Design a protein with these regions (language model features):
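Short, basic/aromatic-enriched C-terminal tail that caps enzymatic domains
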Residues: 252-255, 261-279
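Substrate/ligand-engaging "lid" and interaction regions
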Residues: 243
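Short, solvent-exposed loop/turn elements at beta->coil junctions and helix N-caps
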Residues: 246-252
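A residue-level signal for beta-strand positions that form part of recognition/binding surfaces
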Residues: 1-2, 261
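A structure-centric signal for secondary-structure junctions around beta-strands
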Residues: 23, 258-259
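Nucleotidyltransferase catalytic core that binds NTPs
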Residues: 2-238, 246, 270, 277
């Protein structure tokens, strides 16, 4: 049976017992409202560890002033039931007060310069500071041997890898492949905000990413690829934040050849969607 923890001392006691037994522990951080994509992270984590802990915490420090923290769906009972079905061993459910004992406005914050300041960081200033702040605390609370994050949030994964390397966290960071619906739409908690009419339109994002890859393979100039991608999304009714090609490190390419990642962030109505494709 899955264990749930609301108190840090009890969680640490259980993890200490596992480690005394020589067991490896994996952490899967989430904000709840879980779907198949999240469940795949737990399944992957089981390949790297003997015990899997998922955290559910809607983190106020990563929401911007125009982003409704209170609107984020909270479904803890369903989340725990789903985690149990995929073999999660424990769920950590901290309160805001436990995570930020001095209060959200007075808390010590983390910042990963460079990679956190472009793309999503430019569109959502301070977002990755909040991500780093909460992830660092989760690492200190759970002390996992490995942590699993989805590649759908490609930039978030890059930011966390930078923070872990710079601060020498003794934690292996694993990126999990994007889970998609049959029509290509990446699974996301935000998909539930799409209307019945918007849902098929949202698949334009994945088709556009595939087109960006085709353009790159065909030798098209990056500026042309990005311009055509933006135009395709706008024609479908999206408000585009960015549609870009970057190196795996998220730098602007300075030469042809080498790996690339295409990244898109766009708003359909009031719903902001992100996706990417590595090639």
């Amino acid at each position: 049976m899955i264990q749930t923890f609301n108190e840090l001392g009890a969680l640490r006691g259980q993890i200490a017992q596992w480690k005394r037994e020589g067991l490896r522990v994996a952490l899967v951080p989430t904000m709840g409202n879980l779907h198949g994509g999240h469940h795949s992270l737990v399944t992957l984590a089981r390949q790297y560890a003997d015990k899997v802990v998922a955290s559910i915490f809607v983190n106020p420090t990563q929401f911007g002033p125009n982003e409704d923290f209170s609107r984020y769906p909270r479904t803890p009972e369903d989340d725990v039931a789903g985690l149990e079905q995929v073999g999660c061993d424990a769920v950590w459910l901290p309160s805001v007060e436990a995570m930020y004992p001095l209060g959200v406005d007075r808390t010590t914050r983390m910042h990963a310069p460079g990679v956190s300041e472009v793309l999503e960081g430019a569109s959502r200033p301070g977002h990755f500071d909040g991500v780093c702040t909460v992830v660092a605390r989760l690492f200190l609370q759970v002390q996992p041997d490995v942590a699993v994050f989805g590649r759908k949030d490609y930039q978030q994964l890059a930011v966390i890898k930078q923070m872990v390397a710079e601060l020498s966290f003794p934690i292996q960071i694993v990126g999990a492949d994007i889970v998609r619906d049959e029509d290509g739409l990446a699974k996301s908690s935000r998909n539930q905000y799409l209307s019945a009419e918007q849902r098929p339109v949202a698949t334009t994002i994945h088709r556009t990413l595939l087109g960006m890859r085709e353009g790159y393979v065909a030798g098209q100039a990056r500026d042309r690829i990005e311009a055509e991608a933006t135009a395709a999304l706008q024609a479908a009714g999206f408000q585009v934040d960015y549609a870009v090609l970057r190196t795996p490190e998220l730098a602007e390419p300075t030469f042809d050849g080498g790996g690339r990642v295409a990244l898109i962030a766009a708003r359909l109505g009031t719903t902001r969607l992100i996706d990417n494709l590595e090639f």
